[in-house]
Every structure is written in C-alpha cells, then in structure tokens.
Amino acid sequence: MSKNLNIHFHNISIIGSAKTRFSFSPSKNFSEFRDYNDENPSDLDIVLVSQTLFDDTWTAFREISNQKHICNYSQKTSEIFRQFISIKDSDERYENEHIKDWLKKVMSLKAEMQTRFQIYLDINYRIYKNWEAVEEYHIKGIEKLKNQVIETK
C-alpha cells in the first residue's frame, strides 16, 4: 500500500471498528465490526497522512473551483478547513489530472487488496495534512460519543 500510494508506511493506519472491533463514530453507537460475510458489513477505514498529497489535492480542488461548481462544496470545504480530504470512488473527477491519477491509484490498490488479501469490504480513506489533524478529528468524535453516553445514563 505504501509503495502504491507513495506514502511512508508509518503514515498509513487502519482506524475504526476494523481496528478496535467497535465503532467510535457518534452516529454508530459502538456498533461491532461486521465482516463481509455478515449482513450489512462494516467498511475498512484508513488514515493517510501526507502534507504533500493533502496540499496537491487541495490545489486541485482550488483549480477546479475556478472553472466550475464542486459537488458537495460545503462538505469539501469543511473537510479542508479541518485539514483532511475525502475522495470517494463515485466523486466527480472534473477532468483534473491529479484527481484522476489519484483515483486510478486507489482503484488499483483496492483491486489488489481484494485479490491478494481477500479483503472484500468497502475501503474508505481520508487524506490528512498531519497527525495533529488526525488526532483532533478523532478526539472530537470520541468526546461526542462520551457525551452521548453520559446523556443516556
């Protein structure tokens, strides 16, 4: 994965229920990890930390926004403000070379993970600018979950 994405292996991490067995997402209420054979299987969530990739992707979206409307603009800008970017397989490519090249790499990697490692879960990822942004995002989610637990007692 590290070689395919050109990101140091220390800057790639599995998170979420695939790592902890339970989801810490406030909206999922500690749901347990479900394998691909189970009904409604869980996703595999991956953190990618690369300031260069974050900056290049942000630049690509700025260039795109100068030419046309970006789908889910408010979500994208909210993510960038929090120093991460999510790109889904189904997202518009906008005829931007950086976005198209990145999605080609990711699609190839996902196919390899399925054939080589028999990982058939949907794979989601976020590109973070740095580890501080990862920490801040996940601490806020855990705090929300903690407050929900306290409120229901």
Annotate each PLM feature.
Residues 1-42, 49-153:
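Catalytic core of pol beta-like nucleotidyltransferases
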